[in-house]
From Swiss-Prot:
GO BP: SRP-dependent cotranslational protein targeting to membrane, signal sequence recognition
Family annotation (Gene3D superfamilies): Signal recognition particle, SRP19-like subunit
Positions of the UniProt region annotated as Disordered: 90-115
Protein name from the UniProt record: Signal recognition particle SEC65 subunit
Single GO cellular component term: signal recognition particle, endoplasmic reticulum targeting
Subunit architecture: Fungal signal recognition particle consists of a 7S RNA molecule (scR1) and at least six protein subunits: SRP72, SRP68, SRP54, SEC65, SRP21 and SRP14.
Gene Ontology MF: a single term: 7S RNA binding
Family to which this protein belongs: Belongs to the SRP19 family.
Annotated coiled-coil segments of the chain: none
PANTHER family found in the cross-reference section: SIGNAL RECOGNITION PARTICLE 19 KD PROTEIN, SIGNAL RECOGNITION PARTICLE 19 KDA PROTEIN
Gene that this polypeptide is encoded by: SEC65
InterPro entries, alphabetized: Signal_recog_particle_SRP19 (IPR002778), SRP19-like_sf (IPR036521)
One Pfam family, short name: SRP19
Amino acid sequence: MESKHFCLYPIYMDSARSLSEGRKYRKEICVQRPRYHEIKNALEKLEIEYTDEPSKKHPRDFFNSGRFRIKKEYGRLFVIEGISQTIAELRSKPGSSEETSREKQSRGKAVHGVVQNGVYVENKLNLVRKKKAKKKK
C-alpha cells in the first residue's frame, strides 16, 4: 500500500550538504541551511496542505528538529522548487532578516570548528586540546 504523503526534513533541501550527508534534491533547487520555521512559512504562503511534526528529527541531522508530511498530489519537485523560491524571497526582503543569535555572534569573528563523528561542532570559546607530554626514555 502506497502512502499518500511524502516527508520533508530541512536537511533534504540544504544546499550546503552533499548527497551523502543527507541532501535529497539538486543543489539548483535547494536553499542554504533552511530552517523549520522558514519552510513552515513558505508552505503557508504557497497554501499547500501539510502536517508538521516539530519534534521529529532526521538521523543525519539530529540537532535540527522538524518534519513535514505533504500530500503527493502537489508533486515533490513542484513543492520543493516553490518552497526554495519562497524562502529566497523571504530572506531577500529588507527588515525581515531573521538571524539566529549564533549567526549574530559569529559575524565578524572567525569561528572554527571540528567535525566529530560526522557532526560539525563549533569551537565558540576557542578552546585548544592539551598536548600530551612526551615520555622520556
